[in-house]
């Protein structure tokens, strides 16, 4: 090879190397250090859009910041200068406790939605504490019309049949702070010796915290609360660290200086006062169990002890989202509904339609209850009615990628509770579409003819989460492509615990040293205002029976033949099914219309619940949660029976403001506008695996609303997600099978927003 040829080959090699380097640089980005930008999928993270239909009012939208501000200004002007900011109010003050949406009457709402009548006036409901009046009381005021209020109307007597006693009011944060100040500054120093010995106590040291219980006493008029004391474990659940001290605080007096400790419980024994406990300790008559303060580490921390691993699977929308959120209205190709959050009652949806037809006017959470047992006073007494604390008030921001899918749509909530100005809870709701990884229906045939047909189960989910003290509740409403609605909740968070002593194992399991996980039940109550084919509905119960039958072709033999039993229920008493008792396996609300096959168009209510036994009716507090007697009850819908519970029931359960059992008075339910009231719950006996906290697995209950002859066939037969092919067809062809197109479509990467968390409220 001559020199010229060598130089030519060398030049070609250099050019080739240069070209390859250019290709590599282009592939890594212009600066050679970063990869080229990927092709992002359209609409990676859908956002909430403003309401753009001026012809229709958003009847069910929660109040905006502007509306809340307008109501507060109006009330401040009308009620005078004696109003105190609820965040600073003492029991003897007047203050505005809460402001939220006053729901419109159903008739007026439907007239607007269906017949384009003018919308009903938009109004707010305010709860006002009048502690400074000669006869302290709680008053409910309706304020309107919004956004520029000009009137307020006292509806207390109209709604409750009389004035609301002051002792029924929920406890303000200021009241809790004053109780803590009393306990830590005035009372605990009287037992400094025994508390230092057991619990490393130092006055002002801050190593102990209190936890409330409820109800607050033993009879109407009481306001005496047992408070348990726990180690203050920063960054972890202090609920698992009881020190064995519980105090009964009487805080009924309007002057906090007059509050007293009525009784003391310490590690298995009762004392009249902390001073008596200290005296007995100094005399050597108290056997003290030393409770170690193990700090922030250990199995009770939610911080993982291992480094992050590979990223979990991620669902995204390769061709963009298939639903939208405008204001408080969610719309998909199949479903539409409006959503909101009651400050006390929790999540709710309205005007629920499938393929344009209304199925329900309202589906809403009403109340959640946890009933505890134990051998300490706080544990044995506790019946938490979470509507008093507030399932909206204590809603939490949803953490992207944990509480909801990373690419869900997140929606804020504005509220005015115990403050003079509205606040915003960021990411209070999420809405997302989810591939459940399960066929909605399918069939593979190898007999007679060969084919496959099916449709993937893709659901639309509306979610919020409430944290009530130690427990977190995940509230879901799930919309299926066959017209079914699933309503459920999951419990997670920390268990409540008590000091372990004596016969403690009768009331749960030991979960750590000196700690009992206390047995309890969870129950939630829902209002389901179904409008099946209109407002006039009937209730049908169907089940099965085996009937002795002579064999027609062999009369000397007999078989037990299975057949359907059907009964129309005529009265509210007939349609009230006690918890734990017999109930029909098929119960549905039906219209006077029939489907193609002559059957009444109906929607079935199917419960999925493992509720514990209800509170015995001879219990003095049972009437406050009398809805817990029933797994399901159907009543006539009445504007005077808007809710099965009340924010005031917790602090006076002996004379409840709302007693659900009164709703069931044997009125006819044939051809009426009906409401189904559904209870779902479960028994929880805490165990070692509840440490550090309870998992959602196996701790979810609820109910389904399922079409029952409502359609002529399964409506998902026309789903665009359906797949069908026969043996002679090429299942790998796009023209035959849309799933076969996925590998051929241009690849895209999800456009992920930055991680977000709505933050924390500082109390």
From Swiss-Prot:
Residues involved in Ca(2+) 1 binding:
529-531, 673-674
Write down how the cofactor binds this protein: Binds 1 copper ion per subunit. Binds 2 calcium ions per subunit.
- So which stretches are on the Extracellular side? 28-763
Which positions does UniProt annotate for Cu(2+) binding? 520, 522, 684
Q: What class of enzyme is it?
A: oxidoreductase
Q: Give its E.C. classification number.
A: 1.4.3.21
Q: Where in the cell is it found?
A: Cell membrane
State which ranges are Cytoplasmic (membrane side).
1-6
Q: Per UniProt, which keywords does this protein have?
A: Calcium, Cell adhesion, Cell membrane, Copper, Disulfide bond, Glycoprotein, Membrane, Metal-binding, Oxidoreductase, Signal-anchor, TPQ, Transmembrane, Transmembrane helix
Record's comment on post-translational modification: Topaquinone (TPQ) is generated by copper-dependent autoxidation of a specific tyrosyl residue.
Reaction(s) catalysed by this chain, per the record, are: methylamine + O2 + H2O = formaldehyde + H2O2 + NH4(+); benzylamine + O2 + H2O = benzaldehyde + H2O2 + NH4(+); 2-phenylethylamine + O2 + H2O = 2-phenylacetaldehyde + H2O2 + NH4(+)
The superkingdom of the source organism is: Eukaryota
Subunit record text: Homodimer; disulfide-linked. Probably forms heterodimers with AOC2.
Name it: Amine oxidase [copper-containing] 3
Q: Which organism is it from?
A: Bos taurus (Bovine)
């Amino acid at each position: 090879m001559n020199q010229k040829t060598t130089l030519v080959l060398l030049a070609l090699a250099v050019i080739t190397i240069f070209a390859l380097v250019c290709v590599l640089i282009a592939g890594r980005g212009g600066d050679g250090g970063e990869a080229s930008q990927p092709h992002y999928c359209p609409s990676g993270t859908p956002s909430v859009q403003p309401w753009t239909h001026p012809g229709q009012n958003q009847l069910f939208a929660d109040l905006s910041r502007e509306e809340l501000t307008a109501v507060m200004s109006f009330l401040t002007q009308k009620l005078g200068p004696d109003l105190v900011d609820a965040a600073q109010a003492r029991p003897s003050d007047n203050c505005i406790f809460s402001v939220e949406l006053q729901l419109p009457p159903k008739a007026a709402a439907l007239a607007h939605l269906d017949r384009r009548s003018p919308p009903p006036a938009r109004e707010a409901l305010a709860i006002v504490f009048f502690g400074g009046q000669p006869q302290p009381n709680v008053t409910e005021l309706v304020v309107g019309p919004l956004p520029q209020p000009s009137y307020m109307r006292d509806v207390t007597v109209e709604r409750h049949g009389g004035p609301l006693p002051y002792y029924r009011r929920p406890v303000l944060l200021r009241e809790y702070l004053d109780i803590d100040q009393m306990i830590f500054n005035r009372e605990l120093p009287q037992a400094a010796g025994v508390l230092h010995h057991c619990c490393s106590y130092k006055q002002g040291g801050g190593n102990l915290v209190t936890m409330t219980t409820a109800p607050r006493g033993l009879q109407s008029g009481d306001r005496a609360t047992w408070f348990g004391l726990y180690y203050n474990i920063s960054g972890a659940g202090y609920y698992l660290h009881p020190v064995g001290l519980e105090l009964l605080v009487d805080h009924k007096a309007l002057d906090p200086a007059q509050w007293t400790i009525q009784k003391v419980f310490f590690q298995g024994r009762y004392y009249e006062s902390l001073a008596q406990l200290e005296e007995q300790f100094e005399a050597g008559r108290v056997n003290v169990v030393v409770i170690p303060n193990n700090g922030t580490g250990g199995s009770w921390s939610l911080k993982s002890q291992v480094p992050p691993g590979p990223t979990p699977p991620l669902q995204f929308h390769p061709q963009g989202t298939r639903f939208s959120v405008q204001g408080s209205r969610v719309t998909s190709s199949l479903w539409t509904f409006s959503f909101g959050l009651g400050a006390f009652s929790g999540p709710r949806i309205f005007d629920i339609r499938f393929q344009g037809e209304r199925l329900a006017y309202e589906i809403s959470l009403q109340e959640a209850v946890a009933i505890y047992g134990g051998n300490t006073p706080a544990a044995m007494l506790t019946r938490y009615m979470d509507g008093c604390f507030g399932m909206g008030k204590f809603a939490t921001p949803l953490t992207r990628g944990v509480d909801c899918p990373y690419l869900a749509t997140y929606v804020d909530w504005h509220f005015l509770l115990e403050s003079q100005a509205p606040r915003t809870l960021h990411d209070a709701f999420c809405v997302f579409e989810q591939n459940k990884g399960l066929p909605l229906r399918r069939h593979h045939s190898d007999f007679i003819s060969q084919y496959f047909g099916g449709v993937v189960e893709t659901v639309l989910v509306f979610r919020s989460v409430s944290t009530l003290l130690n427990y977190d509740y995940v509230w879901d409403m799930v919309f299926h492509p066959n017209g079914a609605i699933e309503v459920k909740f999951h419990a997670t968070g920390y268990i409540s615990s008590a000091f372990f002593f004596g016969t403690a194992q009768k009331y749960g399991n030991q979960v750590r040293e000196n700690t009992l996980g206390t047995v309890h039940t969870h129950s939630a109550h829902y209002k389901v205002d179904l409008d099946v084919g209109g407002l006039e509905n009937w209730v049908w119960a169907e089940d099965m029976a085996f009937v002795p039958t002579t064999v027609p072709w062999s009369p000397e033999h007999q078989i037990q033949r299975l057949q359907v039993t059907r009964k129309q229920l005529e009265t509210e008493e007939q349609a009230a099914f006690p918890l734990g008792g017999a109930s029909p396996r098929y119960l549905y609300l039906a219209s006077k219309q029939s489907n193609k096959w002559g059957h009444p168009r109906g929607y079935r209510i199917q419960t999925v619940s493992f509720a514990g036994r209800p509170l015995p009716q001879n219990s003095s507090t049972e009437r406050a949660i009398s809805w817990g007697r029933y797994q399901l009850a159907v009543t006539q819908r009445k504007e005077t029976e808007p809710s099965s519970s009340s924010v005031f029931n917790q602090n006076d359960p002996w004379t409840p403001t709302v007693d659900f059992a009164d709703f069931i008075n044997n009125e006819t339910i044939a051809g009426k506008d009906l409401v189904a009231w559904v209870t779902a719950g479960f028994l929880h006996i805490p165990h070692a695996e509840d440490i550090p906290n309870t998992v959602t697995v196996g701790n979810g209950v609820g109910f389904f609303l399922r079409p029952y002859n409502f359609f002529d066939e399964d409506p998902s037969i026309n789903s665009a997600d359906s797949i069908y092919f026969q043996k002679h067809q090429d299942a790998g062809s796009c023209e035959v099978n849309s799933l076969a197109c996925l590998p051929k479509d241009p690849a895209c990467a999800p456009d992920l927003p930055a991680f977000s968390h709505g933050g924390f409220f500082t109390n």
